[in-house]
Amino acid sequence: MTRKIFTNTRERWRQQNVNSAFAKLRKLIPTHPPDKKLSKNETLRLAMRYINFLVKVLGEQSLQQTGVAAQGNILGLFPQGPHLPGLEDRTLLENYQVPSPGPSHHIP
């Protein structure tokens, strides 16, 4: 019984952390109207589109400022803006895998 309580408590804590992270992400994504409540799915999809937009803007600014494309990746995660695939064809993150800690690991 104690193990079940511990497992339930850990799952509740994990779900609260996930929900908190989504709430923070929702605040960073511009929406119209501004107070629109987004589902988790909508939040992730809009976040990917917004990241794509920002990377393209940074890539274009880099091209305008230097006359050539900036070397390397932005934050080491994404290719340069002008070379990103369109969201219609595939998502930005499909080729990028982040290692996941096991269920017993805690990331501060």
From Swiss-Prot:
Keyword Membrane in record: no
Positions of the UniProt region annotated as Disordered: 89-108
CC terms in the record's Gene Ontology section: chromatin
GO BP terms: midbrain development; multicellular organism growth; post-embryonic development; regulation of transcription by RNA polymerase II; thalamus development
InterPro entries: bHLH_dom, HLH_DNA-bd_sf, TAL-like
Domain bHLH: 2-54
Record keyword Transcription regulation present: yes
GO molecular function (one): RNA polymerase II cis-regulatory region sequence-specific DNA binding
Keywords: Chromosomal rearrangement, DNA-binding, Proto-oncogene, Transcription, Transcription regulation
Disease listed for this protein: A chromosomal aberration involving TAL2 may be a cause of some T-cell acute lymphoblastic leukemia (T-ALL). Translocation t(7;9)(q34;q32) with TCRB.
Matches recorded under PANTHER family: T-CELL ACUTE LYMPHOCYTIC LEUKEMIA PROTEIN 2 (PTHR13864:SF21), T-CELL ACUTE LYMPHOCYTIC LEUKEMIA/STEM CELL LEUKEMIA-RELATED (PTHR13864)
Protein name: T-cell acute lymphocytic leukemia protein 2
Gene: TAL2
